């Protein structure tokens, strides 16, 4: 689904129609297929799904959806990563999640988007109009079951996030985040213990309900204890997973 691409979108404009649609054989070669809802689709339905898909390429910082605007589409991420967030009336931002290849966006929305989504890095998504996509889902039991599973997973993740924000200390929050993140980025396999951090420190802070200074201070403390090392700003190595797990569970 990612062989054809669109021109990069302007950061303040939501994406509109693509000139071309991908062919079904692009779905067969899509690197994110095994990670996404597409993995449940039979060959005949995969052809139909490919016919519905529009491929959109986003540059870093480009807007995919904006909170409060009409929501005619759902999206399947095939490469890159997104930050999903809501804005408070005073302008403060709460990031509610980071999405990676294989994630599906827009399952539980109504007529308007209840969140904004922006690309953290160069990102490609397959975009589907909700009406035709729902019709396909209703005719494909495996796809329907997969989407139900994804929705249940999102609810469980939301409950875990409430616990993280409501009860955990700063070091417990960051340790939990570092343990959880690699499992959400399966399209980017790394060596054991390596964690890819495409997001900025401020974005991590907005996700964990902390300040940038607190995130930096906790990371420095973890490095001093030998729990982690950081070859670069976007690459972290967990040197002591046992201690990281202990901090995440509040045992230290």
Predicted regions and their residues:
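Cyclic nucleotide-binding regulatory module and flanking cytosolic helices
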Residues: 2-59, 103-105, 110
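Polybasic "coupling" helices that flank or enter modular domains
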Residues: 138-211
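Cyclic nucleotide-binding regulatory domains
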Residues: 37, 46, 62-122
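A secondary-structure boundary/capping signal
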Residues: 60, 100-101, 129, 151, ...
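Phosphate-/nucleic-acid-contacting segments
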Residues: 183-252
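Cyclic-nucleotide recognition modules
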Residues: 95-156, 160
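Short aromatic/basic micro-patch
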Residues: 55, 74, 98, 127, ...
